[in-house]
Amino acid sequence: MNWTADFPILAADENGNRLVYLDSAATTQHPMQVLNAVVDYYTKENANPHRGVYELAMRATDAHEGARHTVAQFFNAEDDEIVFTQNTTESLNLVAYSYGMNFLHEGDEIVISVAEHHSNMVPWQRVAKATGAKLVYMYPGENGRLTTEELDKKITPKTKVVAVAMVSNVLGLRAPVEEIVKRAHAVGAVVVLDCAQSAPHTPVDVKKLDVDFAACSAHKLYAPMGVGALYARAGLLEKMPPFMSGGDMIGAVHESGATWADGPRKFEAGTRNVGGEVGFAAAIDYMKGIGWETMETHEHALLDRMLAGMRAMPWLTVYGEPVAEGRYGVVSFNVNDVHPHDVATILDAGGVAVRAGHHCAQPLMEFLGIGSCCRASVAIYNTPEDVDALLENLENVRKVMGL
């Protein structure tokens, strides 16, 4: 099937060419089903949730809590285990500051991968500096994947937190989450899972994975920017202090102090982005209508086609094992001896949109021995013709650069 027609922006031309959007790892486009849901909310239900007793405000509250229920089902979690945030970055910071700053101490160890996005690295660097805990890095093997030997070496009885991306935003490879959780829980550590790049492409069942925290962004799931979700195991949420203070997160306030609201509302200070939350829920419904098996099969075929074409280009380097198996959404590469920005600019002239840069993963770039790279990322709306357009325009890069 072809879902491109659901996404109006993809009907646009770029530089006189059909738009080939291959930057969905940065943000996805929106189907009309999501856009219509957001418009319906703002034209029929817009009010401040949890504030008013009038009918419109009650409908806004229902929309807000209904979206929470949909997100909870998406993660196979309970409603009171889902905190709405702005994005994955805020979700991970919430865990670092509310859990890490309060429950880690000198001599404890925080284990992360060198491949982490800065949002799952810098907060833990700050926690380590503030608490005296030690930050321990895991390094991938030659194929870009974490090995069980590395897990056994780095996860020890001193480990209190293991924070990893389920899928790398650069390499696109799935981490051995099940093996990580088994080892972390065996020593009493909690597992924090960055699902920004996995949630759009493969199920994140928090009960099956048995993780303690999981974070994602709506805008990488065909929904609006400005909304994210944090799953937190209920027992952990109860003992964590609030990350921010203000309206709607309190139980009561007196001159002498304050008490906090129960459940996730303790972490939801201020007016929420309900329109975005409604869009988030609509996007999940859209994905559910397609089905995981259909989505994974479609995207796997696109990656397989892309990597097969790139393997036939000896003047191009792919990062991470250049196979589609165990890879989700992302292929990062460089045209040898050509700056990634030049590659992306030439591709853009042909209507092909990819990202070039360090992808908020500078330590991984250093580990790979490069300063930056290009990244092509696929979504449900991409087609085999999109992949062919990328490959054809990469051939044009070779010709233009005289390779």
What are the language-model segments listed below?
Residues 1-403:
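Pyridoxal 5′-phosphate
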